[in-house]
């Protein structure tokens, strides 16, 4: 099973991905860990080559969960996955979570450092995100037919359990069963 979880910053993608990975006994990957070099004190974008290699390494695995905010570099993963879980969380809640993340990073000294400027930029990005993602997913029929929207863990589990029966085209269901043997 290959699952992509997409949603804006502060939606809870990482939390949901970890719970799903535990429930389904498969690996999880944060796109931020591919996109950003997280070894320093500041956020620095990885090279296109490093990002591409990271994506290819994930695609080669039999099953995975990848979570991230939409970026054009995610496209190979979105095309490869069996199901796209789209998180829908109100902007006010995402804003609260992003501010909590910033305050927690101040207390814990987490690296790379979350700055107030970065946090404000994330809130602004989160505000614009929904329309951009909807436009992107709806413009590609190969992707739009895989999308199931949800807003909490139990709905995500239910979407996965029923997705292959009710929400995905027969061709995808057949491909998923064929891959399993």
Give residue ranges: language-model regions.
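Walker A (P-loop) ATP-phosphate-binding motif of ABC ATPase nucleotide-binding domains
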Residues: 2
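Hydrophobic anchor at the beta1->P-loop junction of P-loop NTPases
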Residues: 5
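The conserved Walker
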Residues: 9
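Conserved lysine of the Walker
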Residues: 13
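Conserved substrate/cofactor phosphate-moiety recognition/catalytic segment
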Residues: 18, 22-62
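Short, well-ordered alpha-helix to beta-strand connector turns
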Residues: 61-62, 81-82, 144
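Conserved phosphate-donor/acceptor-positioning beta-strand/loop module used by diverse small-molecule
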Residues: 81-101
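NTP-dependent small-molecule kinase module
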Residues: 125-181
């Amino acid at each position: 099973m290959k699952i992509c979880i997409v949603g804006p910053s502060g939606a809870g993608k990482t939390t949901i991905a970890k719970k799903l990975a535990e429930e389904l006994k498969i690996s999880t990957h944060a796109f931020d860990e591919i996109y950003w070099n997280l070894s320093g004190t500041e956020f620095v974008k990885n090279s296109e080559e490093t990002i591409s290699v990271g994506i290819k390494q994930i695609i080669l695995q039999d099953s995975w969960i990848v979570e991230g905010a939409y970026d054009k570099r995610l496209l190979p993963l979105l095309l490869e996955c069996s199901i796209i879980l789209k998180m829908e969380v109100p902007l006010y809640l995402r804003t609260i979570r992003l501010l909590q993340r910033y305050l927690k990073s101040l207390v814990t000294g987490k690296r790379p450092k979350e700055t107030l400027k970065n946090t404000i930029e994330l809130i602004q990005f989160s505000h614009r995100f929904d329309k951009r993602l909807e436009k992107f997913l709806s413009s590609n029929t190969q992707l739009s037919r895989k999308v199931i929207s949800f807003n909490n863990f139990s709905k995500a589990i239910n979407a996965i359990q029923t997705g292959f029966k009710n929400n995905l085209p027969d061709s995808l269901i057949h491909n998923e069963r064929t891959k399993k043997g």
